């Protein structure tokens, strides 16, 4: 199947063919330009974990990127954000498996992105992306090629599950699901052990797969007789939903781990009873790592802010606004201390002057009045200085937060590989793999050298 999908000369495919080979899998929708940055993070995590497991287990371990080519939610994949702008294309028809749609649908969005590019570096990346899509027939082919432009095709396998041969392998499970409502019954028997609130669970269907119609449209098959007929005679027309897809992955791959995001962790925790019912080993679920790439200005602003990473992320608009109030309050507090000291000094001076010559009290009073006038001048200068400094600090904070949380959304969910490549270069993905600790789910912050 993989050779037919264009990886005939891949060393990773040859490794996967070895009898003792294992896999670590991740998957994602076919987002424009790979979609949000966390797609790259998931793949990098998968590669890093595969290397570590191979070293520890002394058997071949192959990282696999599972293309969500059968997904039908076009509105989630038809756009990307860059530089505060949204670039999108129209996907018609909207209810078809997106992986089989023509790559040319993405041309207008990528052409607009290229026209909006700032500087030769962005321009080169946008033009390269556009060329990849122009050289591909379908969106699935384009995303596979784009993945391989960042990750080594000799190490990584990219698998399109919308394949008749793979569906034939999965046929026994599809038949059993149609006959027994396997996923639904397993969930009903095990949901009391679900580690999340039940309202976060995906509600299982009586049959947890979509059916492709004669013209390729995707729909739920609620008629179990129809579902069973398709499972027995045309399994290639069935597409596992989110609850059955992990079973599909484990059925056709020697999977020991799955790398996913927080949302995926929820539905994976619905499935242990289904794996048990089928006699399948349950892969380890590893939550993906996170990463943020800062520009030179962003990195400098963060360093000047003096905030650690968690405190920076916790800054709310109200807290940022309070910077000026805090600075002015500090000035007031500092002056109060000095004023107390001055008051004490003047009292001593008045007592000593009175003892020496009562007329000297007049001189002390005049001196005190002059000091009061100077105090007001000093206090006004200090407040102005505090406002200016707090304004600069707030500007620095806003600058770095605009990169870390663009539009209030974590960078890895808003921006794309285009941003990371502009900041860190063409090899940012391999460098990310090398930087990750495969045994943890950490958040890395990359600053320019």
Feature locations, PLM:
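Long, compositionally biased intrinsically disordered regions
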Residues: 146, 150-226, 318-322, 326-449
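A translation/RNA-centric and nucleic-acid-associated enzymatic feature enriched
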Residues: 197-256, 260-273, 282-284, 288-297, ...
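Glycine-rich phosphate/pyrophosphate-binding loops
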Residues: 36-37, 50-75, 283
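N-terminal catalytic cores of NTP/NDP-binding nucleotidyl/phosphoryl-transfer enzymes
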Residues: 12, 19-54, 260
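Short, conserved secondary-structure transition motifs
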Residues: 65-76, 167-168, 290-303
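A glycine-rich helix N-cap at a beta->alpha junction
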Residues: 81-109
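A structural-propensity feature for long, helix-poor, extended segments
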Residues: 79-81, 293-325
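N-terminal low-complexity, intrinsically disordered segments
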Residues: 1-15
């Amino acid at each position: 199947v993989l050779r037919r999908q264009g990886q005939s000369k891949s060393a990773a495919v040859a490794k996967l063919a070895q009898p003792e080979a294992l896999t670590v899998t991740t998957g994602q929708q076919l987002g424009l330009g790979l979609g949000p940055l966390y797609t790259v993070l998931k793949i990098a995590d998968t590669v890093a974990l595969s290397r570590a497991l191979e070293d520890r287990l002394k058997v071949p371990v192959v990282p696999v990127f599972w293309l969500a080519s059968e997904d039908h939610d076009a509105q989630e994949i038809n756009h990307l954000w860059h530089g505060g702008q949204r670039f999108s294309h129209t996907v018609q028809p909207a209810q078809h498996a997106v992986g089989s749609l023509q790559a040319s649908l993405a041309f207008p969005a990528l052409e607009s992105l290229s026209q909006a590019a700032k500087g030769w570096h962005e321009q080169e990346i946008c033009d390269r992306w556009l060329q990849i899509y122009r050289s591909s027939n379908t969106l699935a082919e384009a995303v596979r090629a784009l993945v391989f432009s960042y990750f080594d095709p000799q190490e990584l396998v990219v698998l399109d599950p919308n394949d008749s041969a793979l569906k034939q392998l999965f046929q026994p499970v599809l038949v059993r699901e149609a006959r027994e409502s396997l996923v639904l019954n397993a969930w009903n028997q095990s949901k009391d052990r679900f580690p999340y609130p039940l309202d976060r669970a995906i509600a299982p269907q009586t049959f947890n797969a979509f059916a492709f119609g004669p013209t390729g449209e995707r729909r739920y098959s609620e008629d179990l007789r129809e579902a069973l007929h398709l499972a027995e005679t045309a399994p290639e027309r069935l597409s596992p939903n989110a609850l059955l897809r992990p079973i599909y992955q484990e059925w056709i791959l020697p999977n020991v781990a799955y790398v996913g995001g927080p949302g995926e962790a929820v539905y994976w925790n619905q499935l242990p009873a289904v794996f048990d019912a089928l006699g399948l080993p349950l892969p380890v679920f590893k939550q993906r790592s996170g990463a943020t790439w800062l520009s030179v200005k962003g990195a400098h602003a963060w360093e000047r802010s003096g905030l650690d990473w968690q405190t920076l992320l916790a800054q709310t608009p109200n807290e940022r606004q309070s910077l000026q109030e805090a600075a002015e309050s500090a000035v007031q507090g500092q002056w109060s201390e000095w004023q107390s000291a001055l008051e004490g000094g003047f009292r001593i001076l008045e007592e000593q002057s009175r003892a020496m010559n009562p007329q000297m009290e007049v001189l002390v009073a005049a001196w005190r009045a002059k000091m009061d006038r100077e105090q007001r001048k000093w206090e006004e200068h200090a407040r102005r200085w505090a406002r200016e400094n707090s304004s600069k600090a707030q500007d620095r904070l806003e600058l770095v937060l605009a990169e870390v949380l663009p539009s209030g959304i974590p960078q890895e969910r808003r921006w794309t590989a285009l941003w990371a490549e502009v900041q860190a270069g063409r090899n940012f993905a391999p460098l990310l793999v090398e930087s990750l600790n495969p045994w943890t789910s950490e958040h890395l912050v990359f600053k320019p050298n």
